[in-house]
């Protein structure tokens, strides 16, 4: 074979390996030609997909301990980047012994924070991936944790390999309530796909609401390809505040096609028989316990009365 044909054959083979190899990027996105309706594999044919609509008939109260956010008050350096699909924050592994983690709250393992990213919509009526009674928030933040002792590849093959905390973002005009500023102040540097910037002295508690006691829990999946069903989801009941201007800055980020990325959320997926657990706050728990106590007294009274009549 002539040398130039041999080189050409090798180049073709290399292109096949790169385009079809594991973990390759097949150009998925959120536009009409590459959006969620076109995602293949697990995204199309598996039964425990995310996100979901959290509706009262599908929710059960759960007597779970509170979830602990370890090292979330420690500070460190993170890298913010515009991936062309989302605003991404990583670098937590370099924090070493200060790396944020979660445990408790019904989780059977401890999980280390690997990254967080955001989803948003083109207006305030859409944007969050999860919904509450079919109603959406304008944005949602996902804190992705990997089970301690596992690599990311190993975690993706386990039904509880990842623990993702979902935080709703609610619009507010109160500057005191807004903790999103350390990130939003850097969005001007991240306008184009591929842009990166460092953020020093960052505390992960900046992206948590004040109350983390109440949450919803269910088994689900990644909300992006390959949609692996490896996620224990914790969706916090209390949202975090974000301003109209900050939402505007998110919607100005450009995707890989160099156009404004005004939406990057996956549509709601069917529950397919799954149940959602709700871990209430202190106030809610007191009301529930009071209700249980009253019910217990009534049942006991009826039992005694029945015994007397026999």
From Swiss-Prot:
- Which PROSITE patterns did the record assign? ALPHA_CA_1, ALPHA_CA_2
The UniProt keywords, alphabetically, are: Lyase, Metal-binding, Secreted, Signal, Zinc
The places in or outside the cell where this protein is found are:
Secreted
The residue ranges of the Alpha-carbonic anhydrase domain are: 26-280
Q: Which residues bind Zn(2+) per the record?
A: 117, 119, 142
Q: Which CDD domains match?
A: alpha_CA
Enumerate the catalysed reactions. hydrogencarbonate + H(+) = CO2 + H2O
Provide the E.C. number(s) assigned to this enzyme: 4.2.1.1
A GO molecular function annotation here is: zinc ion binding
Family, as annotated: Belongs to the alpha-carbonic anhydrase family.
Q: What is this protein called?
A: Putative carbonic anhydrase 5
Which species does the entry assign this protein to?
Answer: Caenorhabditis elegans
């Amino acid at each position: 074979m002539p040398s130039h044909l041999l080189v050409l054959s090798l180049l073709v083979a290399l292109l096949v390996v790169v385009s079809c190899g594991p973990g390759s990027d097949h150009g998925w996105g959120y536009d009409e030609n590459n959006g969620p309706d076109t995602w293949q594999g697990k995204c199309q044919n598996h039964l425990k997909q995310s996100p979901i609509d959290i509706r009262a008939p599908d929710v059960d109260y759960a007597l779970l301990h509170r979830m602990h956010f370890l090292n979330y008050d420690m500070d460190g350096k993170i890298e913010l980047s515009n991936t062309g699909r989302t605003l991404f924050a990583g670098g937590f592994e370099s924090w070493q012994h200060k790396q944020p983690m979660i445990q408790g709250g019904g989780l059977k393992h401890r999980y280390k924070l690997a990254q967080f990213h955001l989803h948003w919509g083109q207006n305030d009526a859409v944007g969050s991936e999860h919904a509450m009674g079919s109603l959406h928030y304008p944005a949602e933040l996902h804190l992705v944790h990997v089970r301690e002792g596992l690599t990311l590849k190993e975690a993706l093959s386990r039904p509880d390999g990842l623990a993702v905390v979902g935080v709703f973002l609610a619009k507010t005009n109160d500057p005191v309530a807004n903790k999103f500023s350390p990130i939003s102040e850097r969005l001007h540097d991240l306008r184009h796909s591929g842009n990166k910037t460092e953020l020093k002295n960052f505390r992960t508690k900046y992206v948590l609401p004040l109350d983390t006691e109440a949450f919803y829990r269910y088994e689900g999946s990644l909300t992006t390809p390959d949609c692996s069903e490896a996620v224990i989801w914790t969706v916090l009941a209390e949202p975090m505040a974000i301003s109209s201007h900050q939402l505007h800055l998110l919607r100005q980020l450009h995707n890989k096609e160099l156009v404004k990325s005004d939406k990057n959320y996956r549509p709601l997926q069917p529950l397919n028989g799954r149940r959602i657990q709700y871990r209430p706050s202190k106030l809610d728990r007191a009301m529930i316990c009071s209700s249980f106590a009253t019910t217990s007294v009534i049942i006991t009274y009826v039992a005694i009365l029945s015994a007397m009549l026999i």
